[in-house]
UniProtKB/Swiss-Prot annotation:
This is Bifunctional purine biosynthesis protein PurH. Its EC number is 2.1.2.3, 3.5.4.10. GO terms for molecular function: IMP cyclohydrolase activity; phosphoribosylaminoimidazolecarboxamide formyltransferase activity. Keywords: Hydrolase, Multifunctional enzyme, Purine biosynthesis, Transferase. Pathway: Purine metabolism; IMP biosynthesis via de novo pathway; 5-formamido-1-(5-phospho-D-ribosyl)imidazole-4-carboxamide from 5-amino-1-(5-phospho-D-ribosyl)imidazole-4-carboxamide (10-formyl THF route): step 1/1; Purine metabolism; IMP biosynthesis via de novo pathway; IMP from 5-formamido-1-(5-phospho-D-ribosyl)imidazole-4-carboxamide: step 1/1. Belongs to the PurH family. Pfam families: AICARFT_IMPCHas, MGS. Gene3D superfamilies: 3.40.140.20, Methylglyoxal synthase-like domain. The keyword ATP-binding does not apply. The IMP cyclohydrolase activity resides in the N-terminal region. It comes from Anoxybacillus flavithermus (strain DSM 21510 / WK1). It catalyses: (6R)-10-formyltetrahydrofolate + 5-amino-1-(5-phospho-beta-D-ribosyl)imidazole-4-carboxamide = 5-formamido-1-(5-phospho-D-ribosyl)imidazole-4-carboxamide + (6S)-5,6,7,8-tetrahydrofolate; IMP + H2O = 5-formamido-1-(5-phospho-D-ribosyl)imidazole-4-carboxamide. One of its GO terms (cellular component) is cytosol. Signal peptide: none annotated.
Length: 511
């Protein structure tokens, strides 16, 4: 019996060549609408789907393949006698290949100002149904959803006279991944439309961006996946201009650096190691900001990731060139800057669009057996919630450094303490099990620079010992959430040393 293939694709890339090769191998081609027209125009013998169903396409093409003559031919078990008798009784011919890719829903909803009705019209019904039917019956039917697989199918047909079962099974798995991702994208789009934040079932889909050399450690395997419609302001959407592929740790650190530098409108530079900032600086120019970030901790920046929120010019590139860095992230690089930095073979240069609207996204953490989902911590300082709780108020300079330090400390692993002075971090205490321990680390790092500095804490002081440690180091102002049952002890201690202290009313734990 002559083998038959249904071909109906929105992505026409490679389809004419593939269809011609199938036809040359004796496969009868059945097609629909635009695909049929393209194939016929290129001389491919093709049968209209209506000639198989004996029913016209209706409802503007919404119904054309949803017919027993199609799905009976796809789902029949070939060595089941009853199935074969039923096919013969209803004059249904088996179908051996389904070559389908789906309406461009993703591309449609990515367009600016797309309407709901425009999006809905790009929800494919017949395509996924045929693909799923073929994939379910992959013991007998070859389902092809990816143009990248056309060559493999032809190669095996020529070599073996059939597509091997193991290949059909792999293609079936790809089909179900593809249709599941397609449905998940539609579900997410409509969920966003109706405003459900935490639905009873959460459908998420990601596309493999790259295989990674290894994971967090060399003995771990890893890959990097991105959202189909990832934010332009993201590491997933970053453009790499130079250097070898990003590693697992590179991606994590680059993401952390990008989130921190996004806190600032003024020129800002951030250096990150192991997802914690080792130096952050702001200034009137990006060169000044970077110099501050470097001086914050010139030891830890070695082998780190630097993110800048201004273009890298020749002067800035010369500074960066003198330091061993894994990655530099910026909105852009001048030609002169690229000429300087690309002399270093291993440095990765990334650009990210800083001008786009930064939409709030769910923050997802994988735990064994499930996911934790929360909204992003995008809270910024609100004058309405700031409260000076000490006898002395911060000076104008202290206010500037307090708000700077508060923007940084929310991105440091808890328990977190940040010391800042003159628009730069001078001490970072990260990831400690007690708060005074984090303060001591930050103070030790700051050294003599702690005199006249300010301190930011991501959570309240359970006791007054952190204020005591800060006072002994010469800190003059503190910003913290407040909310401890022993707040009064900390306030009294601050008053004792003439320290100005501000409560924000907002905690910034980060795990």
């Amino acid at each position: 019996m002559k083998r038959r293939a249904i071909i109906s694709v929105s992505n026409k890339k490679g389809i004419v060549t593939f269809a011609k090769q199938l036809a040359e191998l004796g496969v009868e081609i059945i097609s629909t609408g635009g695909t049929k027209r393209v194939l016929a125009e290129h001389g491919v013998p093709v049968i209209s789907i209506s000639d198989v169903t004996n029913f016209p396409e209706i409802l503007d093409g919404r119904v054309k393949t949803l017919h027993p003559n199609i799905h009976g031919g796809l789902l029949a078990v070939r060595d089941d006698e009853t199935h074969q008798q039923q096919l013969q009784a209803h004059n249904i011919t088996p179908i051996d290949f389904v070559v389908v890719n789906l309406y461009p829903f993703q591309e449609t909803i990515a367009k600016p100002n797309v309407t709901l009705m425009e999006a809905i019209e790009q929800i494919d019904i017949g395509g996924p149904t045929m693909l799923r039917a073929a994939a379910k019956n992959h013991a007998y039917v070859t389902a092809v959803v990816d143009p990248a697989d056309y060559h493999l199918v032809i190669e095996q047909l020529k070599q073996y006279g059939e597509v091997l079962l193991e290949t059909r099974r792999a293609l079936a798995a790809k089909v179900f991944r593809h249709t599941a991702a397609y449905d998940a994208m539609i579900a997410q789009y409509l969920t966003n439309i109706v405003g459900e934040t935490y639905p009873e079932t959460m459908t998420m889909t990601f596309v493999k961006k790259q295989s990674l050399r290894y994971g967090e450690n060399p003995h771990q395997t890893a890959a990097f996946y991105e959202k189909p419609l990832s934010s332009p302001f993201s590491i997933a959407a970053a453009k790499q201009l130079h250097g070898k592929e990003l590693s697992y740790n590179n991606i994590n650190d680059a993401n952390a650096a990008l989130q921190i530098v996004a806190e600032f409108v003024e020129p800002a530079a951030v250096a990150v190691k192991h997802m914690n900032p080792c130096g952050v600086g702001v200034g009137e120019t990006i060169a000044e900001a970077f110099q501050k970030a470097y001086e914050a901790d010139p030891t830890s920046i070695f082998g780190g990731i630097v993110a800048l929120n201004r273009e890298v010019d020749e002067q800035m590139a010369a500074k960066l060139h003198d330091i061993f860095l894994e990655i530099v992230i910026a909105p852009s690089f001048t030609e002169q800057a690229l000429e300087i930095l690309t002399r270093k073979k291993n440095i990765r240069l990334l650009t990210v669009d800083f001008e786009v609207e930064r939409k709030k996204e769910p923050f997802v953490v994988s735990v064994r057996g499930g996911l934790l989902v929360q909204d992003e911590d995008t809270y910024t300082i609100d004058d309405a919630t700031l409260r000076v709780v000490t006898e002395r108020k911060p000076t104008e300079e202290e206010w500037s450094n307090l708000t700077f330090a508060w923007r940084v400390v929310k991105h440091v692993k808890s328990n977190a303490i940040v010391l800042a002075k003159n628009g730069m971090t001078i001490g970072v205490g990260a990831g400690q099990m007690n708060r005074v321990g984090a303060a001591k680390i930050a103070i030790e790092q700051a050294g003599d620079r702690a005199k006249g500095a300010v301190l930011a804490s991501d959570a309240f002081f359970p006791m007054s010992d952190t204020v005591e440690a800060a006072a002994q180091a010469g800190v003059t102002a503190i910003i913290q959430p407040g909310g401890s049952i022993r707040d009064e002890d900390s306030i009294q201690k601050a008053n004792e040393y003439g320290i100005a202290m501000v409560f924000t009313g907002v905690r910034h734990f980060k795990h």
